[in-house]
Each structure stands twice: as C-alpha cells, then as structure tokens.
Design a protein with these regions (language model features):
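Ligand-binding cleft/hinge of the Venus flytrap
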Residues: 42-51, 91-92, 115-117, 128-148, ...
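Extended ligand-binding regions for polar small-molecule ligands
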Residues: 39-48, 114, 119-120, 127, ...
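Sec/Tat signal peptide C-region and signal peptidase I cleavage site
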Residues: 7-14
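Periplasmic-binding protein-like
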Residues: 20-22, 96-98, 179-216, 237-241
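Short helices/loops that flank or line small-molecule/ion binding pockets
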Residues: 61-72, 88, 114-115, 151-170, ...
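Acidic, polar ligand-binding/catalytic clefts
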Residues: 43, 54-115, 127-129, 189-192
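Bilobed "Venus flytrap"/periplasmic-binding protein-like clamshell domains
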Residues: 17, 24, 32-44, 104-139, ...
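Extracytoplasmic small-molecule ligand-binding "clamshell" domains
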Residues: 14-85, 146, 224, 233-234
C-alpha cells in the first residue's frame, strides 16, 4: 500500500514499537509480520517523520512489560491516570468505540457500566479500558473474566461462561462473523465509551526527544486525510480476515 505523502526515512537505526498480536483488525500477527490498522498507521507516521521503525506484534501483556522495561514504545494504547505518570503520550492516532456484546437470548441493550452490575464480563488480560471502566471493575460492579484475546472471550460468551464481552466495535464484529455467531451474539446500539489511542514511550526513554516530530507527523497526516484513508483501507481489507 503506497501513499504519495510519505517521505523516505533517513535514520540509521529503527525505533521499536510493540503492538498486540491478537486484536484484529487493529493489530495482529500474520506470520512474522505485525499487520492491521495500527501497524499501518505507525509505519506511515514514522516514515513521514523520517524515523525508521520496527513494528513488532507480541502478546499485549508482554508489550506492556517491554514498555515498562524501556525496551521500546507501544501503540494502540489508552490513556489513564496511572499510565500518565510513567509514559509520554503522542497525539491521538485513532479513536476506538468500546461496545458491549451479549447473547441474543439474554440481551438487554446495556448503555451504561452500571447495567453490568453483578455480571461476569469478558475482558482481555493486561488491558486498561479507561479509568471509568477500570474503576467499576475495582469496585466490584462486575466480575472480570480475563482472556488472552477477543477470540477466547467470544467463545466463552457463546458457551455461556461470561454474560457480556467488552470489545472494540470493529474487532468484536470481526470475531462474531469469523466464529459464526451472528445469529447468537448481538452488541449494544451505542458505545459504552470512546477511547483515543496513542503511541507511548517510557519517560526514561531517549526516544521521547522525537515525540515532537512524531506529533507533527500525526497532525499533518490527519489534516490531509491520510490517517483516515489508511484506517478505512485496512479495515476494508480485513473484512475477510
């Protein structure tokens, strides 16, 4: 996929950016390559900023561990109060809509986190869903069932082992279709939350000196429509994932 606005990178070394290996269509592994919306956005943003980048897909928990160990940055991550103390955030690169999925037989069209009171909710291990949802989990509004990814969560939902799954709309829809659950699982009509996503680096990283360049690239590619075009093209191509 080529974009005329991109300029050749000139740095001799590559910055490492980790992404989740199991969150299609946003970020996932295909063979040895990181693919999906975020890897495509990251490569475009860094190339436009003339910064070489190596995008690596790993389990999300390991991505965060590598970030905490200052082994590289992470993309496709939400901002919360705890993370702001440790990481430097770029400008937003995308906005995700968190949807609630339930079995058709028990669907009550939840619209608020309090609608999950007393339920067992499927979440992804190591994820933050934003301060509001994270706080509700800590307060025991719902009981969290952790899985390695959306696929496992939707399998658990189909089997009746969880009551609800929290998932990004585009990603959840991919798994409902791929697992053949379209006649068994439905999603809420409105998102429970909208979360911007970012590129982040550890505050001890020497790479944070390039964040200004990265932010300028993000702003320019957003203004000329490149980021939106990339997202749409990758999403369209992932419809058959």
């Amino acid at each position: 996929m080529a974009f005329a606005v991109l300029m050749p990178a000139t740095q001799s070394h590559a910055e490492t950016i980790y992404v989740d290996e199991a969150n299609p269509p946003f970020m996932y592994r295909a063979g040895d390559e990181a693919v999906g919306i975020y890897p495509a956005l990251i490569r475009a943003i860094f190339r436009h900023a003339s910064i070489n980048v190596d995008v690596v897909a790993v389990p999300w928990k390991r991505a965060i561990e590598n970030l905490d160990a200052n082994k590289g940055g992470v993309a496709g991550i939400y901002k919360n109060l705890e993370r702001q103390k440790k990481y430097v955030f770029s400008e937003p690169i995308h906005v995700e809509q968190l949807m609630l999925y339930q079995r058709l037989s028990t669907f009550n069209n939840p619209t608020d986190i309090d609608d999950l009171r007393g339920q067992t909710v499927g979440v992804i291990r190591g994820w933050s869903y934003g301060d509001q949802i994270d706080d509700a989990r800590k307060r025991g509004v719902f009981s969290a069932s952790e899985a390695t990814g959306d696929e496992q969560n939707f399998q658990m939902l189909a089997l009746g082992r969880v009551d609800t799954v929290i998932a990004i709309g585009e990603a959840g829809d991919v798994w409902v279709k791929r697992l053949g659950l379209s006649d068994k699982v439905v999603r809420s009509e409105t998102p429970i939350r909208k979360n911007p996503t970012y590129i982040v680096f550890h505050r001890a990283s020497s790479t944070i000196s390039t964040v200004t360049m990265i932010n300028r690239s993000i702003e320019e590619l957003r203004e000329n429509g490149t980021l939106q075009r990339i997202s749409q093209e990758v999403l369209q191509g992932a419809s058959n994932y």
